[in-house]
Amino acid sequence: MHKSYTAIDFETAQGKRWSICQVGLVRVENEIITAQLSILVQPPDNYYWNRFIDIHGITPEQTANAPTFDYVWQQIEPFIKNQQVVAHNGFAFDFHCLKQTLEYYGLATPEFTGHCTYRIYKDNLASLCKQYNISLNHHEALSDARACGELFKIHLKTYNNERNNKKTSRK
């Protein structure tokens, strides 16, 4: 199974998927975190909905001088392009955020293989972190990405153990 993967999380400034205001990214290789990125991003027009500020606590003042996504993409792309990428609720949210934001800035969406810990566990991130005793500062992108990476690591260990047990029982 996958020995290396990137866990990602995006926070948005409003209801538009292309309004990314924070990127959290964790690279895991052989069960060890080898890289982490937490980047505040200025969304288009630095425009926020108040209810989104209430969720993640990021304000227009914090991103007023932050780079826009097209400038930070070169830092992020190597962790995504041709990689195994995991996000919690990735197919409903994070992967769409990435694609729509890249389209907004006229950038190509790279090939990657997506995985979703919500689809694997069928529960929300906060509940899973409590269940598995994983530290979480919910809606802070790096913390969410780190938690997602830990959940995926647990899944991979469980999957590999089940596969090994099936191989052993066939002998």
Region spans (language model):
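Amphipathic alpha-helical interaction segments
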Residues: 97, 147-150
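Short, charged, surface-exposed loops that flank catalytic or proteolytic processing sites
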Residues: 140-143, 161-162
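Acidic two-metal-ion nuclease catalytic site recognized across multiple nuclease folds
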Residues: 1-3, 149-171
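Active-site flanking residues adjacent to catalytic metal/cofactor-binding acidic residues
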Residues: 8, 115, 143
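Conserved non-catalytic scaffold segment of RNase H-like nuclease domains
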Residues: 1-107, 111, 126-139
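Short, flexible loop segments at boundaries between secondary-structure elements
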Residues: 112-125
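Generic alpha-helical structural context detector
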Residues: 119, 130, 150-153
